[in-house]
């Protein structure tokens, strides 16, 4: 309730707002502090909703959420939908593509990302990444993977990958997380996990004719 109200008030006041969850708090906004093996490599990662930012840090006791105003003016943007390109990009940066890293289709996707100031893409949490990894390991086909992943509804992430992009971010506020908020967040995460498992089970039965990774990246 309160969380949602807070988010709506911020959005009403500033319109273009993004949220960033931090496990220990931010001393500065930077790209260099980012890990290499995130979804799209190094960058400053933000999401469209407060809850979504919260869901990535609610397990940690000192975690908090920040809101930012942003602009996409004069920036090079690479957008992804919930599709094969998106899945391959994330598996590339998270290091599970193995022999396919130098495949021409993969290289093309990575080049576009490296040229961009900002990447906008559906969010993938660890549960979703586990499904993607099953695809890259040849255990499930692309249709099964994408159908299961479309259940997630985590919204979009905005990855600011260059200094030029970071200049378009203006901090608004910092929010500390209450105990009930953390509890509620864990409950939602467990429900989501169950939902994705169910979807995967059904998709395996339904999409038997989809292509496997070795057929796509010949």
Predicted regions, residues:
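Short, small-residue-biased leader/transition segments that mark boundaries at the very start
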Residues: 1-4
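ADP-ribosyltransferase catalytic core
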Residues: 8-16, 31-42, 48-110
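Short polar catalytic/cofactor-binding loops
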Residues: 21-28
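Short cationic amphipathic helices and targeting signals
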Residues: 42-45, 119-121
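Active-site and NAD+-binding cores of ADP-ribose-processing enzymes
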Residues: 72-218
């Amino acid at each position: 309730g309160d969380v949602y109200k807070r988010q709506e008030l911020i959005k009403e006041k500033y319109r273009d707002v993004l949220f960033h969850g931090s496990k220990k708090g931010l001393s500065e906004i930077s790209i260099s502090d980012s890990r290499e093996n995130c979804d799209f490599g190094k960058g400053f990662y933000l999401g469209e909703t407060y809850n979504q930012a919260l869901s990535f840090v609610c397990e940690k006791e000192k975690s908090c959420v920040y809101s930012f105003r942003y602009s996409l003016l004069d920036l090079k943007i690479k957008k992804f939908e919930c599709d094969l390109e998106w899945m391959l990009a994330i598996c590339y940066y998270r290091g599970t593509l193995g022999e396919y890293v130098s495949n021409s289709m993969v290289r093309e996707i990575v080049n576009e990302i490296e040229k961009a100031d900002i990447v906008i893409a559906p969010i993938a949490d660890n549960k979703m990444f586990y499904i993607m990894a099953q695809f890259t390991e040849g255990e499930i086909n692309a249709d099964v993977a994408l159908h299961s992943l479309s259940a997630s509804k985590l919204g979009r992430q905005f990855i600011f990958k260059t200094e030029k992009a970071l200049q378009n971010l203006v901090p608004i506020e910092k929010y500390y997380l209450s105990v009930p908020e953390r509890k509620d967040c864990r409950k939602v995460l467990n429900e989501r996990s169950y939902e994705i498992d169910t979807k995967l089970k059904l998709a395996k039965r339904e999409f038997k004719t989809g292509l496997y990774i070795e057929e796509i990246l010949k």
